[in-house]
Regions:
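Acidic, PIN/NYN-like endoribonuclease modules and their adjacent C-terminal/linker elements
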Residues: 2-14, 19, 24-25, 29-40, ...
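Short active-site oxyanion
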Residues: 17-21, 65-70
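Short, conserved beta-strand edge motifs with alternating hydrophobic and charged residues
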Residues: 24, 44-47, 72-75
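Short aromatic/hydrophobic-glycine micro-motifs
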Residues: 40-41, 69
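Conserved BB-loop
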Residues: 42-57
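Acidic, metal-associated active-site segment
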Residues: 55-69, 124
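Acidic, metal-binding active-site segment of PIN/NYN-like and related structure-specific nucleases
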Residues: 68-83
Length: 153
């Protein structure tokens, strides 16, 4: 098995410059498709990887940071700063809406107001490790009443 960069090859070049997210098993597959097709995000979805399907939350938290991805979930446990210290993350986005369409509306706002607000131009694959993540070291809980303000570190 090679390195992650060598295994992804050309795909990594296609999605560089796009928001890079790590989506846990609590997020519906339809929403993952929306992230990829409508928002053009670079998505690692744990349910598509047998070795990650049953990993504990702490492992997902660690892997998201190691892979330089913002963790996206519907699991509010990630908001517990004692269990998941913000400074040890690449950023956490916790979503909540009663229906999937509401989640899509929230993701469009997050894409526009948070992830792409200060977006850098397309980044070379080798520079991904040096590019700061939009929510690095912070957590954001978005829901239908979200006023657009970020949760401070």
């Amino acid at each position: 098995m090679g390195t992650l960069a060598s295994e992804l090859g050309g795909y990594a070049e296609q999605v560089s410059g796009q928001p890079r997210v790590y989506v846990d098993a609590n997020v519906p597959a339809g929403l993952v498709s929306f992230m990829r097709q409508a928002l053009h995000w670079d998505v690692l979805f744990v349910l598509e990887h047998d070795e990650l399907r049953r990993a504990p939350d702490g492992e997902h938290y660690r892997l998201a940071r190691q892979l330089r991805r913002t963790l996206i979930t519907q699991d509010r446990d990630y908001l517990d700063d004692r269990k998941f210290p913000p400074e040890q993350s690449g950023g956490v986005l916790v979503l909540w809406a009663p229906v999937e369409k509401g989640l899509m509306v929230l993701l469009k706002r997050v894409d526009r107001e948070v992830l792409r607000r200060n977006a850098l131009p397309q980044t070379a694959v080798d520079e991904i490790a040096e590019t700061p993540l939009p929510l690095e070291g912070r957590k954001l809980h978005v829901h239908i009443d979200w006023d657009g303000e970020r949760i401070a570190p």
